[in-house]
Regions:
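Conserved BB-loop
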Residues: 28-40
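Short catalytic-loop micro-motif centered on adjacent basic/acidic residues
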Residues: 31-32, 56, 83
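Acidic, metal-binding active-site segment of PIN/NYN-like and related structure-specific nucleases
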Residues: 42, 50, 54-67
C-alpha cells in the first residue's frame, strides 16, 4: 500500500517550533523531544525514523550524509532525509511545506533533499 503524505521526524537540533507550524498546516510532524529520543545517537535517530516510516529533518548534514550513503551501500531503505540549513523556524517550515505539498511519501523513499 502506498503512502501519500510524508510524515516528518525532526531530530533534536531542529527547532520544535517548526513541528508546531507544520502541524498547524495539517502535517504529521514529530520531534525527537516528543518521541523521548533527545540523547539518541545519529544512527539511532535515523533507525527510529525508519521504524516509524518518517522522513528525517536535520541540520546535521555531515553525519547524516554519511549515514544515508551507508544505507545506500548496504541496501537498507529509509523514508528520506531532508537537510535544512539553519534559518529562522518560519522559513524552514515554509520550505518544508513546499516539499510536503509537492512530494509524496513514496517519492521521498531513499531520497535526500536540501532546503
Amino acid at each position: 500500500m502506498s503512502d501519500f503524505f510524508i510524515r516528518l521526524y525532526l531530530d533534536e537540533d531542529v527547532n520544535v517550533m517548526i513541528a508546531d507550524l507544520l502541524k498547524a498546516s495539517g502535517f504529521d510532524s514529530l520531534t525527537a523531544r516528543d518521541a523521548g529520543r533527545l540523547s539518541a545517537s545519529d544512527e539511532e535517530q535515523l533507525a527510529y525514523a525508519v521504524s516509524q516510516k518518517r522522513t528525517l529533518v536535520t541540520h546535521n548534514r555531515t553525519d547524516f550524509e554519511e549515514l544515508t550513503q551507508l544505507y545506500f551501500h548496504t541496501e537498507q531503505m529509509h523514508y528520506g532525509v531532508i537537510f535544512a540549513v539553519r534559518r529562522p523556524p518560519q522559513e524552514i517550515a515554509q520550505r518544508l511545506l513546499v516539499i510536503l505539498n509537492q512530494v509524496t511519501a513514496d517519492e521521498m523513499e531513499n531520497q535526500v533533499r536540501y532546503i
